[in-house]
Amino acid sequence: ASLRLDRYRAFLVRDLNQTIYHQSYALRFRLRHMPRRGEESVYTGTLSGLALGHGTIRIDMDSVPNEREGVTILLRNPVSPEAWRYSREHSKSLKLESKDLLDPLVDGVNQSPFELLMPFVFWDATYEKSGRVAGRPAHVYRFSCPEWVREAQPSWVRITLALDDTYEAPLRVETFSNRSVSHKIFLLNSLKKIESTWIVKTFDCKNRADSSNTRFEVLSAALQLDLDPILFAPEGLGRELTIPPEAFLSTK
């Protein structure tokens, strides 16, 4: 079981120097926030990286509240998380603190950069059990929260991760406080095969406190791209991510 987790850790931070060509990707996505009561809100954007599953991620939001133009977020190095936020309106890039990873990706939604970067995978881990999660055989690991998380979220005690037995991909992530019931759940809903590659199509991020759900849905995908690595560096966040529309294949 520990070897399985070690393999997944290594996959997230693998060296791309030898395999960077034709590995880049871009996913057009929709964030749909569904509160228990009230109106839904929808945001769109592009998530991209130098290789699927790697721990360097760029997120270009088309529009966000309180900004006339969209913003770009760079996440990297889940072992020691780093993040930057670039405002196209102000042409300025700001390095974020670790605790900022826990803030919503967009005001009012459940999804945060934390769920996308998954730094907890590298925290102290304990194997809990095997069983079925989302209808699939899985292995569940428990992670203790480090000091920077406890300072930002004092109620958080532990996080659990369910890895698929066959594909070694995350099926479910749960965040626990002192209670035995999780207060936040990240759940994989569906996958989609684009040509010969399986990608995530939808996952939910549920908040038990207010019974809301934010659904991340991939609308189209462009794979096997050659993207300039500078796009995934802090100094390159002001550069536009330009990908021909015909490169995107629908997930419908």
How would you label these PLM feature ranges?
Residues 46-80:
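Mid-chain, structured segments of secreted extracytoplasmic proteins
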Residues 31-33, 61-63, 85-89, 145, ...:
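Beta-turn initiation residues at beta-strand->coil junctions
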Residues 2-11, 20-21, 39, 67, ...:
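Flexible, processing/modification-adjacent segments and terminal tails
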Residues 15, 27, 59-60, 91, ...:
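Buried hydrophobic packing residues in well-ordered domains
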Residues 105-107, 111-116, 134-233:
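Gly/Pro-enriched, hydrophobic low-complexity segments
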Residues 39-44, 180-183:
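Amphipathic hydrophobic-ligand
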Residues 18-36, 57-59:
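A short, Trp-centered hydrophobic/proline-enriched beta-strand micro-motif
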Residues 13-14, 45-51, 76, 187-193:
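Extended lipid/amphipathic-ligand handling interfaces
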